Amino acid sequence: DEKYTNQYTVNKLFSDENPVDALKRELLTLSVEDYMQTVKDIRFPKRSEMREFGKVYNGTDDVYIKIRVELLGMYGNTTTFVMSFHFAEKAFTPEMFPYKKN
């Protein structure tokens, strides 16, 4: 379903913005309370683990965010890869967020 694609979600939420700028800004707003879980990459097991987050936009739109942070280059610079940023296929529930304060 197109609604659950990265492109559709970014275009819907940030229609008047450069998508790269919008995603960079949104990543900077993530907090430990948005954290859901850490997952291994089954397809690329030698890569670093991925972190899953969830945020609610416009009061009702659950958005699933998955990132991978890797050390690249000889100076150990970190690069963040956005693996997923799309409307959640299942509604978020409180137990999905281990560090969320009520």
Model-derived features with residue positions:
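Functional cores of ribonucleases/endoribonucleases
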Residues: 29-77
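Enriched for short, Lys/Arg-rich terminal
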Residues: 62-63, 68-102
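Compact soluble domain cores
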Residues: 1-47
